[in-house]
Design a protein with these regions (language model features):
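Walker A/P-loop
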Residues: 29-66
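Canonical AAA+ ATPase core
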Residues: 81-86, 103-111, 119-171
């Protein structure tokens, strides 16, 4: 398909020398999957994700995960609105077409779980109210190589993700 070739060529103008990875990420995007990019710092993980977002024209958000990132930062929260006397949903970063989840290994297992649940179910639930994620919805996760993404109970997160079939991992 010529349109697909053109898209890949535009991305490869920014992401040089990683044609195979770019093609695999594109396959995941087209299939509605998610991608984990695991590599040492400074190798273009964020640049790759942003190139995809720009070329595809998708609404994009980036979350730089830290140890104090909480689930509500990602999925959203309800706020009491004095004027109406009710609660209003304030969407989190996940309400986008392409989410760059940068340095996922730096955040708590609780926050990782909230993100993974949304990735699998394609929706978020806040205060008993369910909100669908936009379509298309793709998460590009980045992690430092050798970060050992491990849940608090010692279960290796990558094995869980692969078993769920919600992403492919590229290094």
């Amino acid at each position: 398909n010529q349109k697909l070739k053109t898209i890949l060529q535009e991305i490869e103008k920014v992401v040089v020398g990683k044609n195979e990875i770019v093609e695999k990420i594109m396959m995941a995007v087209l299939a509605g999957g998610h991608v984990l990019m695991e590599d040492v710092p400074g190798t273009g993980k964020t640049t790759t994700a942003m190139a995809f977002a720009k070329v595809l024209g998708l609404d994009t958000r980036r979350v730089q995960f830290t140890s104090d990132t909480v689930p509500s930062d990602i999925i959203g929260y309800s706020v009491y609105e004095k004027q109406t006397g009710g609660f209003v949903f304030k969407p989190g970063a996940i309400m986008t077409n392409l989410l760059l989840a940068d340095e996922i290994n730096r955040t708590s297992s609780k926050t990782q779980s909230a993100l993974l649940e949304a990735m699998e179910e394609m929706r978020v639930t806040v205060d008993g109210q369910t909100y669908p994620l936009p379509s298309p919805f793709v998460v590009l996760l980045s992690s430092g190589q050798g970060s050992g993404l491990v849940h608090h109970n010692g279960v290796h997160m990558m094995k869980i993700l692969q078993r769920l079939g919600i992403f492919e991992q590229y290094t």
